């Protein structure tokens, strides 16, 4: 398998794992917030504000995973080394 194929595969797996974790985390956070509001409707404003801040922090993990995957795909620091190695192997 070539270097670039491995980069694409690594980015795909990294993004899948990153979004899976954040999706589960966001689901659990919303579940807990809804349970809290159902127990104490008077505190719904405070609970929702705290939940939104928490969801933003959880979502930042998915954004970091996306940035790392884009770096792997488009700005890979090892691209030049891999191309030189491929040229020497081809000769």
From Swiss-Prot:
CDD domains: ATP-synt_Fo_c. The keyword RNA-binding does not apply. It comes from the Bacteria. The chain crosses the membrane at residues 4-24, 53-73. GO terms for cellular component: plasma membrane; proton-transporting ATP synthase complex; proton-transporting two-sector ATPase complex, proton-transporting domain. It is found in: Cell inner membrane. GO terms for molecular function: lipid binding; proton-transporting ATP synthase activity, rotational mechanism. It is a multi-pass membrane protein. Its main location: membrane. The record marks 59 as: Reversibly protonated during proton transport. InterPro entries: ATP_synth_csu_bac/chlpt, ATP_synth_F0_csu, ATP_synth_F0_csu_DDCD_BS, ATPase_proteolipid_c-like_dom, F/V-ATP_Csub_sf. F-type ATPases have 2 components, F(1) - the catalytic core - and F(0) - the membrane proton channel. F(1) has five subunits: alpha(3), beta(3), gamma(1), delta(1), epsilon(1). F(0) has three main subunits: a(1), b(2) and c(10-14). The alpha and beta chains form an alternating ring which encloses part of the gamma chain. F(1) is attached to F(0) by a central stalk formed by the gamma and epsilon chains, while a peripheral stalk is formed by the delta and b chains. Belongs to the ATPase C chain family. F(1)F(0) ATP synthase produces ATP from ADP in the presence of a proton or sodium gradient. F-type ATPases consist of two structural domains, F(1) containing the extramembraneous catalytic core and F(0) containing the membrane proton channel, linked together by a central stalk and a peripheral stalk. During catalysis, ATP synthesis in the catalytic domain of F(1) is coupled via a rotary mechanism of the central stalk subunits to proton translocation. NCBIfam families: ATP_synt_c. This is ATP synthase subunit c 2.
